[in-house]
C-alpha cells in the first residue's frame, strides 16, 4: 500500500476507534510488562543484541528498551506495555531516485513468496491462517514499513517468521513482478489476436491513486518543495514511469535496501522481548554481516528566494461552481524532524494557526468565501527529513490566486504582531492531555507510524514519545518568553525564503491527455517488439495465467487451528437504569484512565419524510453554529477547553431478526476528562435546548466544506459508495442508508452548496431539532471508571432533566413501528432491573418487496469501483454465520485470484454485513463487465462446493480475527447499546460460526446466491462504458 504522507501534527495522539468485539480484558491498571522491561540494564547481551537504553515513559504507560544487533548494526526498539494486542514491524529506509515505483512494487513482490515459504502469495494466505488484528505493508516517501499485530503468542511467532522470510529472503520471481508491477499482455491472454495492453496491480493502483486531485496536489507539493533528492520523485510510482522499471532493477533495489544494517525493528505489547530477539536473530540477522548502507537523505539546499509552480488536474464533476476549481497553497520548509522539541513546537504552532474557527487562517481564508476548504496537506507535515508547513484554499477562481497569497502573508504579519490568546493555547494543551489518556486498540500501530519518520533519519524515537517532557519544556518557554510562538512564526514563515506557491487548475482534457500519453507509450513499446518478443509475451501471459489458476499448496506456511480460538466470549458487565423518569441509561465501568465517554441515541421516527435527507447536514453543523449565549467561535473554544470532541451522526441500525425492520436515529457522542464532566453535560444541555440556527454566513462556509470533503472522499471510498447504492433496493433500510451515506447525499450537498439563497435549507434545521433534540425516544450510555460512576450518574441525570420533552406524544411518520425490548442474557452481560430495560422502537415494512436496480455513476476516473449486493438473512438466523464464512472463503479462494491477480484490480472480495446484505466488490479496477462476470463465476464456484475442510477452517480463523478484534474501554457495551446484541446472542452466533460445515456452506450458496434478479442489485462508479451505455437495464447517472 502506498501512502503519500505520514506523521502530521501529533499523529500519535489521533484516536482510532476499536473493533466490534473484544476477546481479552484490558489491564491498564497493571504494569507487569513495564516492570519486567525495567529489569534490563545497559550493556545486557540478549540473543545477539546489546541493550543500550532503558527508559520509563509514564505518560504513555510504557517502558522503552533500545537495542542494537552486534553483527549487523540493526536497530531495535521494544515498547513494553500491558496491552495484549502485540505488534511487530520492520522498517527499511528506501530512497528511490526515479518515479518507477520500485520501492512500492518491491513491497508488493516480497510478499509473493520467500525461501522458507515458496508458495504463491503467503501474505494473503496468512490472513486466513492467523488471528491477526492487523496485517499490511506501507510504502512512504523514504521508508517501507511491514507491521502486523495479534493477541495470540503462537500466532505472533508464526507471523514473525513469515514477515522475516518475506523481507530478507524473498523469491522475487519474474512472474510475480509481472503480476504486481506491470506487464505487456494480450487483452485475452489466451488469444494472441487480441490487442496488447498494459496490466499490473501497482500500475492500476497508482492510476487510481492519481484520480484523486488532492493526491496529485500533495505529490507535486512535496516534489517541488524538496527537489534535491528522493522527495523529488513519486515513491509509489508514476503510472507512466512504472512502465520503465525492469525486473533486474527491482532485484538490485532489494539487494541494496533490504539489509539488516538498513533496518529498524519495532515490537510493542506485553509479550516477552527475549523470544522476539531470539527468533529475529536466528531466522534472519545471524545470516548477515554489517554493511554501510548508502541510503541517507541529505539536507535540502535552502532557496535564496521563493518559487512558484502551476500544475493541472482533472475536472471535478461535483464542483459546486465549475468556474471555481483551482487550488493554491503557500508552503514553507521547516527544520529537520530529528530536532524533536522543535518539531513538537511547530506541530502545536500549526494547530494554533489552522485548527478550528478561532484560528487565524480559518478566519482569513475559510471565512473569506473565496474557496470551499483548506488546500490539501494543510498544516504541519513531518514525514520528510525536513518538515514543512502548508496553507491555502481549494475551490477558488483562478483569478483569486494572488488574493489568497496576499491573505496568507497578511495573516502571518498579524500573528507576528498579536500572537495567540491564552485560552487557545490552553485548549490545545488540554487536547494533548485528553489524547494521551484516551486508549486506542491500535496503539502499537499508531506508535510505529508516529516514530517511523524521525527514526528513519536517525532521530531518537524515545525522545519523541516523552510527551510529558515536551509539554513541560513548551510551557517553560512560553513562561520565560511570552513572544516565543510569535518569534517562531517570524523565523519560519515571515523571514523564510524557502517558500513555494503551488497552484493547480482543472483541465477538461486532463484524463484524455493522460490516456493519450499512455496510448503513445503502448504504441512505441508494441512497435519495438520483434516477432520473437511477441511470442514470448504470449507465452509468458499463458504461463502467468496458468500459475494464477493452479491450486497452490500452502502447507509450508504456519497456521493456527480452529481449536486455538477461544470458545466463549468474556462477559461485559453493564447496568441499565431509568433516569429522569423513563430514559434508560447504560453504565459500563471500565479502566478509562480518568476519561468519561457519553453517548445518546435519539429516534427519528416522528421526523417528516421531507426532512429526512437533511439529517446528515443537521448532524454535521449542530455543534458548530453556537448554542445558548455562545456564538460559534465561543462554542468551539469551550468544546476544545472542556471536551475531547462533541459530534452527532445519523445511524440506520438493522434488526437482528428481521430483514425488513430497522431503527433510525442520531447518535450524539462526546468524551472528556472526569473533572470536566459537568461542563461537557452543560454544553450538551445548551445544544439540545438552545442551538443557534441564525448564523447564515457561517452555515454557508460549513456547507461548502462538507460538500468538498464528500467529493474528495470518493476516490478512496468508491467501492463503499457502489455497495451502498447496490443495496438500496434490497431492504427498507437500504434506501435510508443511501440517503444518509451514499451518492444521493453527495449529490444533495452539491446542490445545496450551489444555492445562492441558502435560507430555505437553514429554516429546516429548527424543524429537525423539534423532533430530535428532546428526551422522547432517547437512550444514553456512559463508560467511565467505577470511581467516577456516582459523579457521572448525577451529571447525566441533570442533563436529562434539563432537556425538553413533548407535551403530547408524537406519532411515528411510518405507519408500522414495533417496540422491541432489548433482552438481557443469562450470562450476566447486563444487569437489567425489572421494567427498566432498553426498548427500541423499530420501523417495519411488512409488504416490502426487493427489486433489482443497476446504476452506473459516470466519474472522470481511469479505474472503476464495482459493487453487487444480494439480500440474505439477518444476524440471528443460523444461515448468517454460514454466509459470513462463505464470504471469506470466496474472497480468499476465488475472488482474490480472479479480480486482483488476473484482473489487475487493486482489491476486491466478498463480505456479509450485519444487516444481512452480501456484497461482492472491486476497488481501483480496470474492468467492469469482466468483474461482474467474475462475481457470477464466484457464485458458481461456491455452489459447486469445490473447497476443502482446510479451506473452511482457514476462513473461520479469518472471520474470528475480526469477531475477536480488541475493543477499547471507551467502546465496551456499544453492541448492546446500539444494536441490542447481548453477550448471550453474540455467544450463540459464535457457536453458529464454529458449527459451519461444508454442507451448510453448500446449502446457503444455493439458497441465497444467484436465486433471482429481485434479490440482486449492481452499481459501478467509473468512466463511460459503451457496453453498459447500450444496455437499457442500466441507469446512467
Swiss-Prot record:
It is found in: Mitochondrion matrix. GO terms for biological process: protein processing; proteolysis. This is Presequence protease, mitochondrial. The active site is at 107 (proton acceptor). Residues 803-834 are annotated as: Disordered. InterPro entries: Metalloenz_LuxS/M16, Pept_M16_N, Peptidase_M16_C, Peptidase_M16C_assoc, PreP_C. One of its GO terms (cellular component) is mitochondrial matrix. Zn(2+) binds at residues 104, 108, 205. Residues 804-814 have a biased composition (Basic residues). Keywords: Acetylation, Disulfide bond, Hydrolase, Metal-binding, Metalloprotease, Mitochondrion, Protease, Transit peptide, Zinc. The modification N6-succinyllysine is found at residues 770, 849, 946. Metalloendopeptidase of the mitochondrial matrix that functions in peptide cleavage and degradation rather than in protein processing. Has an ATP-independent activity. Specifically cleaves peptides in the range of 5 to 65 residues. Shows a preference for cleavage after small polar residues and before basic residues, but without any positional preference. Degrades the transit peptides of mitochondrial proteins after their cleavage. Also degrades other unstructured peptides. Its cofactor is Zn(2+). Gene3D superfamilies: Metalloenzyme, LuxS/M16 peptidase-like. Its EC number is 3.4.24.-. Mainly exists in a closed and catalytically competent conformation but a closed-to-open switch allows substrate entry into the catalytic chamber. Substrate binding induces closure and dimerization. A disulfide bond may lock the enzyme in a closed conformation preventing substrate entry into the catalytic chamber, participating in redox regulation of the enzyme. Inhibited by metal-chelating agents. Inhibited by nickel and zinc excess, and slightly activated by manganese. Belongs to the peptidase M16 family. PreP subfamily.
Amino acid at each position: 500500500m502506498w501512502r503519500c504522507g505520514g506523521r502530521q501534527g501529533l499523529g500519535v495522539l489521533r484516536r482510532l476507534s476499536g473493533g466490534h468485539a473484544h476477546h481479552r480484558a484490558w489491564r491498564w491498571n497493571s504494569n507487569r510488562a513495564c516492570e519486567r522491561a525495567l529489569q534490563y540494564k545497559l550493556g545486557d547481551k540478549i540473543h545477539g543484541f546489546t541493550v543500550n537504553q532503558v527508559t520509563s515513559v509514564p505518560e504513555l504507560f510504557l517502558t522503552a528498551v533500545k537495542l542494537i544487533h552486534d553483527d549487523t548494526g540493526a536497530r531495535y526498539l521494544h515498547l513494553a506495555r500491558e496491552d495484549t494486542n502485540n505488534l511487530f514491524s520492520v522498517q527499511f529506509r528506501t530512497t528511490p531516485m526515479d518515479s518507477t515505483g520500485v520501492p512500492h512494487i518491491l513491497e508488493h513482490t516480497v510478499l509473493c513468496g520467500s525461501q522458507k515459504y515458496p508458495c504463491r502469495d503467503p501474505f494473503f494466505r496468512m490472513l486466513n491462517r492467523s488471528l491477526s488484528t492487523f496485517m499490511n505493508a506501507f510504502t512512504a516517501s523514504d521508508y517501507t514499513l511491514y507491521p502486523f499485530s495479534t493477541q495470540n503468542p503462537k500466532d505472533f511467532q508464526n507471523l514473525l517468521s513469515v514477515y522475516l522470510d518475506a523481507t530478507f529472503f524473498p523469491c522475487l520471481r519474474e512472474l510475480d513482478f509481472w503480476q504486481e508491477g506491470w506487464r505487456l499482455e494480450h487483452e485475452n491472454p489466451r488469444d494472441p489476436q487480441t490487442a496488447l495492453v498494459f496490466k499490473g496491480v501497482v500500475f492500476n493502483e497508482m492510476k487510481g491513486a492519481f484520480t484523486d486531485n488532492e493526491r496529485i496536489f500533495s505529490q507535486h507539493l512535496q516534489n517541488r518543495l524538496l527537489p534535491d533528492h528522493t522527495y523529488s520523485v513519486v515513491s509509489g510510482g508514476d503510472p507512466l514511469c512504472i512502465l520503465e522499471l525492469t525486473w533486474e532493477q527491482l532485484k538490485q533495489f532489494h539487494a541494496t535496501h533490504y539489509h539488516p544494517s538498513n533496518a529498524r525493528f519495532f515490537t510493542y505489547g506485553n509479550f516477552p522481548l527475549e523470544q522476539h530477539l531470539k527468533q529475529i536473530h536466528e531466522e534472519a540477522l545471524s545470516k548477515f554481516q554489517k554493511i554501510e548502507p548508502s541510503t541517507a537523505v541529505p539536507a535540502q539546499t535552502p532557496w535564496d528566494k521563493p518559487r512558484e509552480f502551476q500544475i493541472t488536474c482533472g475536472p471535478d464533476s461535483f464542483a459546486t461552481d465549475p468556474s471555481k476549481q483551482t487550488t493554491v497553497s503557500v508552503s514553507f520548509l521547516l527544520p529537520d524532524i530529528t530536532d524533536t522539541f522543535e518539531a513538537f513546537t511547530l506541530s502545536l504552532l500549526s494547530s494554533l494557526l489552522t485548527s478550528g474557527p478561532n484560528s487565524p487562517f480559518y478566519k482569513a481564508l475559510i471565512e473569506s468565501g473565496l474557496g470551499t476548504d483548506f488546500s490539501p496537506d494543510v498544516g504541519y507535515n513531518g514525514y520528510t527529513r525536513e518538515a514543512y508547513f502548508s496553507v491555502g484554499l481549494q475551490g477558488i477562481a483562478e483569478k483569486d490566486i494572488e488574493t489568497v497569497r496576499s491573505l496568507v502573508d497578511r495573516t502571518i504579519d498579524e500573528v507576528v504582531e498579536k500572537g495567540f490568546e491564552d485560552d487557545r493555547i490552553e485548549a490545545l494543551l488540554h487536547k494533548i492531555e485528553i489524547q494521551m489518556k484516551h486508549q486506542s486498540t491500535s496503539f502499537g500501530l499508531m506508535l510505529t507510524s508516529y516514530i517511523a519518520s524521525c527514526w528513519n533519519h536517525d532521530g531518537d524515537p524515545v525522545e519523541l514519545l516523552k510527551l510529558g517532557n515536551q509539554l513541560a519544556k513548551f510551557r517553560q518557554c512560553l513562561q520565560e518568553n511570552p513572544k516565543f510562538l510569535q518569534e517562531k512564526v517570524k523565523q519560519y514563515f515571515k523571514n523564510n525564503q524557502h517558500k513555494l506557491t503551488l497552484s493547480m487548475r482543472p483541465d477538461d482534457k486532463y484524463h484524455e491527455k493522460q490516456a493519450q500519453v499512455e496510448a503513445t507509450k503502448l504504441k512505441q513499446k508494441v512497435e519495438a517488439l520483434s516477432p520473437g518478443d511477441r511470442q514470448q509475451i504470449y507465452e509468458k501471459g499463458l504461463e502467468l495465467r496458468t500459475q494464477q489458476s493452479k491450486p497452490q499448496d500452502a502447507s509450508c506456511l504456519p497456521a493456527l487451528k480452529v481449536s486455538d480460538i477461544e470458545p466463549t466470549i468474556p462477559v461485559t458487565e453493564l447496568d441499565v437504569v431509568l433516569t429522569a423518569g423513563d430514559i434508560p441509561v447504560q453504565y459500563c465501568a471500565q479502566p478509562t484512565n480518568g476519561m468519561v465517554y457519553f453517548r445518546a441515541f435519539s429516534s427519528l421516527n416522528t421526523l417528516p419524510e421531507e426532512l429526512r435527507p437533511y439529517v446528515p447536514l443537521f448532524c454535521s453543523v449542530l455543534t458548530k453554529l453556537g448554542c445558548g449565549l455562545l456564538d460559534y467561535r465561543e462554542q468551539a473554544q469551550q468544546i476544545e477547553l472542556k471536551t475531547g470532541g462533541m459530534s452527532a451522526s445519523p445511524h440506520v441500525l438493522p434488526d437482528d431478526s428481521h430483514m425488513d425492520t430497522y431503527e433510525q436515529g442520531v447518535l450524539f457522542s462526546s468524551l472528556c476528562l472526569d473533572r470536566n464532566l459537568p461542563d461537557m453535560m452543560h454544553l450538551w444541555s445548551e445544544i439540545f435546548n438552545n442551538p443557534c440556527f441564525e448564523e447564515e454566513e457561517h452555515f454557508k462556509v460549513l456547507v461548502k466544506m462538507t460538500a468538498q470533503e464528500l467529493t474528495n472522499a470518493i476516490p478512496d471510498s468508491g467501492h463503499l459508495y457502489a455497495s451502498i447504492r447496490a443495496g438500496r433496493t434490497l431492504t427498507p433500510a437500504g434506501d435510508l442508508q443511501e440517503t444518509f451515506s451514499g451518492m444521493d447525499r453527495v449529490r444533495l450537498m452539491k446542490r445545496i452548496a450551489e444555492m445562492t439563497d441558502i435560507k430555505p435549507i437553514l429554516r429546516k434545521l429548527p424543524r429537525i431539532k423539534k423532533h430530535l433534540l428532546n428526551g422522547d425516544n432517547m437512550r444514553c450510555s456512559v463508560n467511565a471508571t467505577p470511581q467516577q460512576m456516582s459523579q457521572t450518574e448525577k451529571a447525566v441525570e441533570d442533563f436529562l432533566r434539563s432537556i425538553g420533552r413533548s407535551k403530547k406524544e408524537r406519532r411515528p411518520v411510518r405507519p408500522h413501528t414495533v417496540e422491541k425490548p432489548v433482552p438481557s442474557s443469562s450470562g450476566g452481560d447486563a444487569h437489567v432491573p425489572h421494567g427498566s430495560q432498553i426498548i427500541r422502537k423499530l420501523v417495519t415494512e411488512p409488504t416490502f418487496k426487493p427489486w433489482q436496480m443497476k446504476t452506473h455513476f459516470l466519474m472522470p476516473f481511469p479505474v472503476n469501483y464495482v459493487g453487487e449486493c444480494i439480500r440474505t438473512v439477518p444476524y440471528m438466523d443460523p444461515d448468517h454465520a454460514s454466509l459470513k464464512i462463505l464470504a471469506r472463503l470466496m474472497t480468499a479462494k476465488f475472488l482474490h485470484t480472479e479480480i486482483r491477480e488476473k484482473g489487475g484490480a487493486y482489491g476486491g472480495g466478498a463480505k456479509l454485513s450485519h444487516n444481512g446484505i452480501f456484497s461482492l466488490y472491486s476497488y481501483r479496477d480496470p474492468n467492469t463487465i469482466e468483474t461482474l462476470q467474475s462475481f457470477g463465476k464466484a457464485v458458481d464456484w461456491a455452489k459447486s462446493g469445490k473447497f476443502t475442510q482446510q479451506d473452511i477452517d482457514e476462513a473461520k480463523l479469518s472471520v474470528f480475527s475480526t469477531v475477536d478484534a480488541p475493543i477499547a474501554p471507551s467502546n465496551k457495551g456499544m453492541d448492546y447499546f446500539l444494536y441490542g446484541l447481548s453477550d448471550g446472542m453474540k455467544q450463540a452466533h459464535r457457536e453458529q460460526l464454529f458449527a459451519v460445515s461444508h454442507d451448510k456452506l453448500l446449502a446457503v450458496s444455493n439458497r441465497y446466491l444467484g436465486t433471482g434478479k429481485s434479490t440482486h442489485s449492481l452499481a459501478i462508479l467509473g468512466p463511460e462504458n459503451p457496453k453498459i451505455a447500450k444496455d437499457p437495464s442500466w441507469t446512467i447517472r
